[in-house]
Regions:
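Blade-level signature of beta-propeller repeat domains, shared across WD40, Kelch, NHL, RCC1
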Residues: 274-309
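Residue-level detector of Asp-centered blade-edge/turn motifs that repeat once per structural unit
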Residues: 26-27, 68-69, 108-110, 150-151, ...
């Protein structure tokens, strides 16, 4: 493995249960977290020790989405619906009852929110008017993860039936079904140039799909010992990271798909349990990770170190 210098910048605590999700905020140094304790917190990478409680919901939260145009944070309230939170005032602006199931992911594109649910539905919402536009039901198994491709106008959704389904962003027609994994798909992620779709899930395989060739399989890598929970690129698109139930974060070269670094507890004071979600910020390219161990870690990754560890 090539040398990548890893430095742990901060260990953030405050949540009282497993931390399931992260979302970027209105500026590069701001981000949000939510957990099994129903708490939504705001953090500043310039002073990561000073968290701020933004909202407290009754049930666990698996999904957050920040809408930049409105300055609102959308929280997926499991077994209920979504809550629109004015983060500046720390007040709820609106809510929408959606489902009795869990809400696993929320993404947005222009005036639309896409919500992945445990019932297998992907619910399309007109967020400025807080109303349901469409319910896409193509599986009885959970819809777990969503990625938006504005170039090809595609919406990729990973399901617990091991398939990735690709929908047209305008018509909501199903345009492709990828028999992708042997078990649940937990993460789908487009490359920043939208030429590749990466996926990972319970089978611990990292899969790469060629978008320009109608999502033909390009590569399959046994990437982790246990389930891959999340995949995210750095802002420039030169590298990406995967995180897993095996407690590790792995750093990859995006062009060669070469594994560059393993970040874990023994070598880097990493997480002690499953790493659930990551956020690669544009604030000094810092990487943020959240875990079942109730902590958030902030990392600096140097790909051009002047000296080796």
């Amino acid at each position: 493995m090539s040398k990548v210098e890893v430095k742990k910048l901060a260990a953030i605590t405050g949540h009282k249960d497993c931390i399931y999700t992260l979302a970027r905020g209105g500026t590069s140094q701001l981000f949000y977290s939510a957990a099994g304790d129903g708490m939504v917190a705001s953090w500043d990478l310039e002073a990561p020790e000073n968290g701020r409680l933004v909202a407290k919901l009754d049930n666990s939260i698996y999904a957050l989405c920040y809408i930049h145009e409105a300055g609102f944070l959308v929280a997926g309230h499991n077994y209920d619906g979504i809550h629109f939170i004015d983060t500046a005032k720390g007040k709820e602006k609106a809510s929408l009852k959606l489902t009795d199931a869990a809400i696993f992911d929320i993404q947005y594109y222009r005036d639309l929110l896409f919500v992945a649910t445990g019932s297998g539905e992907v619910i399309v919402i007109d967020w400025p008017n807080v109303k349901i536009v469409r319910r896409l039901k193509f599986s009885d198994k959970s819809a777990r993860t969503i990625a938006v491709n504005p170039v090809d106008r595609h919406l990729a959704v990973g399901y617990s039936d091991a398939a990735i389904r690709v929908f047209d962003l305008q018509t909501y027609d199903l345009v492709n079904t990828i028999d992708s994994h042997t078990n649940s798909v937990f993460s789908v992620c487009y490359s920043p140039d939208f030429k590749w779709l990466l996926s990972g899930g319970r089978d611990a395989h990292l899969k790469v799909w060629d978008v320009e060739k109608d999502y033909v399989a390009y590569e399959s890598i046994v990437a982790h010992m246990y389930a891959i929970n999340h995949i995210v690129y750095n802002p420039s698109g030169s590298h990406f990271v995967t995180c897993s139930m095996d407690k590790s974060i792995k750093v990859w070269d995006a062009s060669t798909l070469q594994l560059l670094k393993v970040i874990d507890k023994s070598r880097h004071a990493g997480h002690g349990t499953s790493v659930n979600k990551m956020l690669w910020t544009s604030y000094n390219d810092q990487l943020v990770s959240a875990s079942d161990d109730r902590s958030i870690s902030v990392w600096d990754l140097n790909f051009n170190p002047s000296h080796f560890e």
